[in-house]
Amino acid sequence: MLALRTSVGLTKNLFTRRLHISPVLLKKKPSHKGKGGPVEDEEIDIVNPSIYVDELVSKFDKSLELYSKELTDKRKGSVNANIFDNLSLKNGALFKEMASTTLKGKGSLLVTVFDPNEVKNIVSAILASGQNLNPERVPTNNQQLKIPLPPPTAESRQNLCKELKTVFEKYKQSPSKNSLGHIRNEVMKKLKSLQKKDESVKKIIQNVEKVHKDYVTKLSEQLKQAEKSVMGQ
């Protein structure tokens, strides 16, 4: 009997020490009730609180990466090497099947026609595209066309800044799974499902809010830099 008490006491002390070393939170599992039978006891998950902040930061980093790429793509505006890809030629072929387009610096496009016999058809397709672009023959290569791009106007710059702002709002707060607001709300739902509502939970919630605020600031800073670039500042 003495040995049994000693064993129980030792086990209890070890369990208590483990809890002090690694703080945990409790999360309810849904109870199950069989037909005509008693309700089963609720099971409890032991959750390490740090996983919520880790999850938040990981998803925020991914969103920030996507946001940065979308801002960059949007900032290019009409300077897009794929601008002609879906144009149709007189013979019914698609532009991208007959030629390729690359950026040549910031002020022009370079079109390389695969078959020199199709150069006239390519020129006609570009002129008919309604984009107000005029291809010029490259003197040193009869299969290449240089297309000067018109300089952006004050109006076009302002419109592009509005588009950048739309991208910012999408990643700041929208139903998109990649928006910071959506990710934050999902993590908060998980925190609210915890059974243990004490100071440890409050601290985690405060940390989540701080991290969210920091990442919104990062979005805002990238937007300001993109707007300055567009406005030529």
UniProtKB/Swiss-Prot annotation:
One of its GO terms (cellular component) is mitochondrion. It comes from the Eukaryota. One of its GO terms (molecular function) is ribosomal large subunit binding. InterPro entries: Ribosome_recyc_fac (IPR002661), Ribosome_recyc_fac_dom (IPR023584), RRF_sf (IPR036191). GO terms for biological process: mitochondrial translation. PANTHER family: MITOCHONDRIAL RIBOSOME RECYCLING FACTOR PSEUDO 1 (PTHR20982:SF3), RIBOSOME RECYCLING FACTOR (PTHR20982). This is Ribosome-recycling factor, mitochondrial. It comes from Candida glabrata (strain ATCC 2001 / BCRC 20586 / JCM 3761 / NBRC 0622 / NRRL Y-65 / CBS 138) (Yeast).
